[in-house]
Amino acid sequence: MSPRNRFLALAALALTGSLALTGCEGLDDLPDPARSDDAAPAPGGSALEAAEGLTVKGRAPKTGYERGEFGSAWIDTDRNGCGTRDDILADQLDDVSRDDDGCKVLSGVLDPDPYTGTRITFERGRSKVDIDHLVALSDAWQKGAQKWSDGKRRAFANDPLNLVAADSSTNRSKGEGDTATWLPPNKAYRCEYVAGQVSVKKKYELWVTRAEQDAMREVLAGCPEQKLPSGGNPTEAPTR
């Protein structure tokens, strides 16, 4: 640090201390609405190493699971005025057109669809594009989410880190499958797909079965440079 910069830094520290002594709040004392420990992104890094580090346990019973346990579908957890489904469509489709409200996505193009590698034209109401949870809600329920708060389950169901626009028929063939039981037909997307699942499970501290971890290893061993995606929403949704 140069002498001039060192002087400026010391002056700034002195000013902050002076403000505190006079009863004023320093800048560091002001609340930062954009900052939250829960909002910290899942750290990037090797997806394969992260998969190795996931907790391994058996699948718990599905008893008590229903979609409503994860809140109403597609709520506005980030408080931007739009539901999560439309946020994801707007982010992942090209040539998007919206309703007059500025939120509802009426049409767009998914090119390529990650699950099939094909080009799909989206028109609202035609049901050719679904928003898929990379880690299915029922899978999460059986691997830790039963114990979560309602707010954490709502956050999980609406976290962009766990959501992808995809061909509807292919998505529905997946059901509640994990890596051991289902992979997208588009082999070029499998590394990214599995890395996404690993990142979500790491972020939300969900466990995996032994077969699931083995399948993750097998896919990611073919792309050892694959990194974890990061980001998404806080792990607790706002109180509605």
Where are these regions (language model features)?
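Domain-level detector of nuclease and nuclease-like folds
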Residues: P114-R240
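N-terminal low-complexity, Pro/Thr/Ser-rich intrinsically disordered segments
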Residues: D32-E69
